[in-house]
């Protein structure tokens, strides 16, 4: 399993604009190898909002299949370029090395 994050710096007070774009079912949910998505808002930033989109995939090839798909191009087509509230962004790939799950509570 891999996790891919896209961390975006957003003009202060506008993080919700990016978050709202992910608050509905999209096309990524239908992609082979897609395991889930979380949208994270960093707490206590002063000069800008920081939003991280974290996606989980069976393999890097599954993520690459998403980025090459017509669905990805459609989801990321910004008329007039990148929205002006996005100051910067960074993509990071992680290999998942250990996963721990909660134990059932004793009865």
Curated annotation (Swiss-Prot):
* Residues annotated as binding heme: 76
Protein location: Cytoplasm
- According to its UniProt record, the EC number is 1.14.14.18
Which Pfam families does the UniProt record give? ABM (PF03992)
* Gene Ontology terms: cellular component: cytoplasm
Q: Which family does it belong to?
A: Belongs to the antibiotic biosynthesis monooxygenase family. Heme-degrading monooxygenase IsdG subfamily.
* Listed PANTHER family: HEME OXYGENASE (STAPHYLOBILIN-PRODUCING) 1, SIGNAL TRANSDUCTION PROTEIN TRAP
Q: What does this protein do?
A: Allows bacterial pathogens to use the host heme as an iron source. Catalyzes the oxidative degradation of the heme macrocyclic porphyrin ring to the biliverdin in the presence of a suitable electron donor such as ascorbate or NADPH--cytochrome P450 reductase, with subsequent release of free iron.
Give the protein's recorded name: Heme-degrading monooxygenase
């Amino acid at each position: 399993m891999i996790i891919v994050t896209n961390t975006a710096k957003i003009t202060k007070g506008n993080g919700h604009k990016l978050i709202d774009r992910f608050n509905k079912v999209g096309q990524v949910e239908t992609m082979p190898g897609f395991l889930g998505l979380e949208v994270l808002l960093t707490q206590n930033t002063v000069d800008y909002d920081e939003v991280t989109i974290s996606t989980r995939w069976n393999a890097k090839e599954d993520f690459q299949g998403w980025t090459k798909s017509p669905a990805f191009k459609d989801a990321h087509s910004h008329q007039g370029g990148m929205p002006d509230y996005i100051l910067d962004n960074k993509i990071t790939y992680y290999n998942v090395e250990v996963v721990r799950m909660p134990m059932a509570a004793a009865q």
